[in-house]
């Protein structure tokens, strides 16, 4: 991200002020200087908050996979793009270079094409955390198919609900997955789900556990039968800025899952920019986010954000407590991880174990540690800061949502002074406001209210797949002219934000 790294606090305030005063100019420059476009946009942003219609970089032509892979081949072809750390520590890790990842993605795109997938088709992906998960997502994006990743822990009925909602033509799954000392029959779950999915024509099966599985003739296809002979050349599809990139379902606390639709250009620009700044990423760093790719954190900060920056990203198949409760710390030491991004749930459960599990590992490579998924409580923050960060690596306590596409409020390492349990300050381009129950904006500090965002940002989801009315009502009706996050927040005496929890049942007087 040329010219857009924030170096210190005065620089943050300067950039932030610029981004609020003239958001169009701010994002125009970032998009122009840091990405490869087939054609430039004729309008930076166009929006109607009442109708919940938002468009960024309208008129632009691009492909996100070209920006994640192809453009790095000259300078970073031999650099490791993905380090895959398997569930079992005795199994060898894979180091996949940008060149090899590009070849794998082209081969996969050719396989999908051979099996009848075209631009605009929806492909559901139900895979464990194996390299093929990243490869299939990037292949879909390269060929213009819309991926919808379903977390490989969901039941057959949860899978069927999501597959039917987006009318997927294909499901990509594996024979099974490993979780700790258990092998799980993923193909069996998909067989049950597909019985209720009339739009699914084909199921593509990746081998992982090599267990015996039933294959239905004419519907089920083994990747191994197609992949070896597939070409490593594939003509990248040229996409419009607002073409769908992926649908990701968020359960939320009420009603059926919402298929959040993210589009190509805005999501690309926002995830790349936020990754670079929030994790203080430098050229040869090793970055590890422990989330599952089935969640938005994995989409934005395991796959797209890091690869857009030419980074090395770790994909971990296992769990934090297998074979012992020091697996996270062992992986950090083994791969000399510089940035580590995990959830408060994991931090709390690992904090219950003896601190000897952490102390026995060399974590000196760590420079930044992060938290995501929910507000981190005071005790967990201090344990993480003291034992993992050794009081040297700043904690980036990030607030964002499936709907926002990328991080919205967060400290920037070595820039923003941290404060336990506070997400601190908004990133450039993000205008948080607190609202009261009478829909009035609450000004000043030491106040709390409903957290809304005043102006659109490039990463915002554009709609709920197939139900724009629900999107409008959920996010834009409670506080007209603003995006309502569904969260409450407080603003302290210096303007730092702390998320106080969900407000889904907010009553407007």
Task: List each language-model region with its residue ranges.
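Conserved ATP-binding/catalytic segment of the ANL
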Residues: 443, 452-509
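Conserved AMP-binding/adenylation subdomain of ANL enzymes
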Residues: 268-286, 296-339, 353
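Conserved pre-ATP/AMP-binding loop-to-beta segment of ANL
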Residues: 78-80, 204-205, 216-249, 256, ...
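ATP-dependent adenylate-forming carboxylate-activation enzymes
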Residues: 127, 148-164, 176-185, 266, ...
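ANL superfamily adenylate-forming
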Residues: 89-90, 170-241, 353-354
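N-lobe entry segment of adenylate-forming
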Residues: 1-96, 100-103, 107-110, 189, ...
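Gly/Ser/Thr-rich phosphate-binding loop
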Residues: 308-311, 338-342, 351-420, 431
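Conserved AMP-binding/adenylate-forming core of the ANL superfamily
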Residues: 65, 82-138, 155-160, 215, ...
């Amino acid at each position: 991200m040329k010219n857009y790294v924030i170096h210190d606090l005065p620089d943050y305030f300067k950039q932030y002020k610029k981004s609020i005063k003239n958001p169009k100019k701010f994002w125009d420059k970032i998009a122009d200087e840091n990405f490869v476009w087939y054609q430039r946009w004729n309008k930076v942003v166009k929006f109607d908050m009442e109708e919940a219609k938002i468009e960024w970089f309208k008129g632009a032509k691009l492909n996100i996979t070209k920006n994640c892979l192809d453009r790095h081949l000259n300078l970073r072809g031999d650099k490791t793009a993905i380090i895959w750390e398997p569930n079992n520590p005795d199994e060898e890790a894979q180091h996949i270079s940008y060149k090899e990842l590009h070849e794998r993605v082209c081969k996969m795109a050719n396989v999908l094409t051979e099996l009848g997938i075209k631009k605009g088709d929806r492909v559901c992906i139900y895979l464990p955390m194996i390299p093929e998960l990243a490869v299939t997502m990037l292949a879909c994006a390269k060929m213009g198919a819309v991926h919808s990743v379903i977390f490989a822990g969901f039941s057959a009925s949860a899978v069927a609900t999501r597959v039917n909602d987006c009318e997927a033509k294909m499901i990509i799954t594996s024979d099974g997955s490993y979780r700790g000392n258990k092998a799980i029959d993923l193909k069996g779950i998909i067989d049950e789900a597909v019985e209720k999915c009339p739009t699914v024509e084909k199921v593509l099966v990746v081998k992982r556990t090599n267990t015996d599985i039933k294959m239905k003739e004419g519907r089920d296809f083994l990747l191994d039968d197609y992949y070896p002979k597939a070409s490593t050349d594939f003509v990248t599809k040229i996409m419009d800025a607002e073409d769908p990139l992926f649908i990701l379902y968020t359960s939320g606390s009420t009603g059926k899952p919402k298929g959040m639709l993210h589009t190509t250009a805005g999501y690309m620009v926002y995830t790349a920019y936020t990754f670079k700044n929030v994790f203080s990423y430098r050229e040869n760093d090793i970055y590890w986010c422990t989330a599952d790719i089935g969640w938005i954190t994995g989409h934005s900060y395991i796959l797209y954000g890091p690869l857009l920056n030419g980074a090395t990203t770790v994909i971990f198949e296992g769990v934090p407590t297998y074979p012992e409760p020091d697996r996270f710390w062992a992986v950090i030491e083994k791969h000399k991880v510089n940035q580590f991004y995990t959830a408060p749930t994991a931090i709390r459960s690992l904090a219950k174990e003896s601190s000897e599990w952490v102390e026995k590992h060399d974590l000196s490579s760590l420079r930044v540690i992060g938290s995501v998924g929910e507000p981190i409580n005071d005790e967990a923050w201090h344990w993480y800061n003291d034992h993992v960060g050794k009081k040297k690596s700043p904690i980036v306590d990030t607030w964002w949502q499936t709907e926002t596409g990328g991080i919205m409020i967060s400290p920037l390492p070595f820039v923003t002074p941290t404060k336990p349990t506070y997400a601190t300050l908004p990133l450039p381009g993000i205008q948080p406001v607190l609202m009261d129950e009478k829909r009035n904006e609450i000004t000043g500090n030491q106040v709390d209210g409903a957290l809304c965002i005043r102006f659109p940002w490039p990463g915002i989801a554009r709609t709920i797949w197939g139900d724009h009315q629900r999107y409008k009502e959920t996010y834009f009706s409670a506080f007209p002219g603003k995006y309502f996050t569904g969260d409450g927040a407080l603003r302290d005496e210096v303007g730092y934000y702390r998320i106080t929890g969900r407000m889904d049942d907010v009553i407007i007087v």
